[in-house]
Amino acid sequence: MELVVKSVSPETLKTATLVVTINESRVLIGAAQLVDIKSGGAISAVLERGDLAGKSGQTLLLTNLQNIKAERVLLVGIGKDGELSDRQLKKIAGSVLSSLKGLGGSDAVIALDDLSVKNRDTYGKARLFVEALADGEYVFDRFKTQKAEVRPLKKITLLTDKVSVADVERAANHAQAIATGMALTRDLGNLPPNICHPTYLGEEAKALGKAHKNLKVEIHDEKKLAELGMGSFLAVAQGSAQPPRLIVMNYQGGKKGDKPFVLVGKGITFDTGGISIKPAAGMDEMKFDMCGAASVFGTLRAVLELKLPINVVCILACAENMPSGTATRPGDIVTTMSGQTVEILNTDAEGRLVLCDALTYAERFKPQAVIDIATLTGACVVALGGHTSGLLGNNDALINQLLDAGKLADDRAWQLPLFDEYQEQLDSPFADIANIGGPKGGTITAACFLSRFTKAYEWAHLDIAGTAWLSGGKDKGATGRPVPLLTQYLLDRAGV
């Protein structure tokens, strides 16, 4: 969808639909007031009749108003003036888009200035609104024989004052890039595991590299993984007919020699649990166990769209975890790329086994910071539910930067402790470390495991097990998170 930013009087614009806001006090301001005056009190009349209360999300369509060039005027309730939350703003954007899709017009004009959001400046408000519009546009129907109906809406114009045009344009540019990245993340996550396997992700990475001159792509197969000494990574993949892949995408947007930011994504394209097999109920959703890798893919796509002046390395640790006669057994001991040995007590704690070797591999890039993203633990879902990602790490400044980015992007994370006492739960009588730490503090002990492989750099871990996808029902599917958080973090580092 085309998005345009303008600073003109709303009643003078020729458009299929003009969207104006009404608050609960029903005192007309901004665009609604101008349209009301020009139309001879048409909006005041419907409010006096009680046709619209101004409650958040309510809509009322008016047509053929005199002296108004718009064919339709859509009144949208926004609740109490100045008290909109981020969540309410997104719901209003969804309500507007839903109403517009039900109309026949190919374009619409939205008076953005009249939306006042708590703790948001013009840029922040506009970006969230545009991201919400893009989210409402997303459809995944690749495998449907009857495709979703194509709506006629092709263009949206955002109205603002002259002083704010540059801020709104910047917000729209950032939002559209983030939305593109989220859509790619959702597409990859929603693909079935018989299509989206490690080799497929490697081919997608190659295609992205061919399309961008400043993106170098390397695909390491199982032979190369063995040469690198990635015994832990290979142990996860050895039960599957699908070969593993370590995908490395190196974006050079900054100066040569600038230390890169490294994103490491868990890419288990299907997780049965291996020999420690999962229950059958809900196992289909284990195709989403690669959403960490998918979010890194999507963040890179946003970075490419924005042409950020920084260097970013993306490492995707991709494998399939299957039971078979060649699968890893509980009790097996493997040697990681770092040289540390791991006793595998549970083959369903496989994400950390591929990540530990990928995190060791990241050292060679001499990074400014490393962030790994993984659907790692069910314990994180129990602790934080489906609204907030878990965040742990070894550097307070990095943690705070990510927390701040999450707040600005409305893609929040919450810090959990990484105290030394938890490390003791990973003690093994037979190896340097066990791959599980018992039933208590599972998210923390998983991060403790990873921390053993990140001592050479500043590191943070995002556990997105609760936020990467929605389970069951008509809304089931990948969410695209935490692309907004990660992209905001990189925007902040780039200073744009």
Curated annotation (Swiss-Prot):
Mn(2+) 2 binds at residues 266, 271, 289, 350. It catalyses: Release of an N-terminal amino acid, Xaa-|-Yaa-, in which Xaa is preferably Leu, but may be other amino acids including Pro although not Arg or Lys, and Yaa may be Pro. Amino acid amides and methyl esters are also readily hydrolyzed, but rates on arylamides are exceedingly low; Release of an N-terminal amino acid, preferentially leucine, but not glutamic or aspartic acids. Keywords: Aminopeptidase, Cytoplasm, Hydrolase, Manganese, Metal-binding, Protease. Binds 2 manganese ions per subunit. The keyword S-adenosyl-L-methionine does not apply. HAMAP family: Cytosol_peptidase_M17. This is Probable cytosol aminopeptidase.
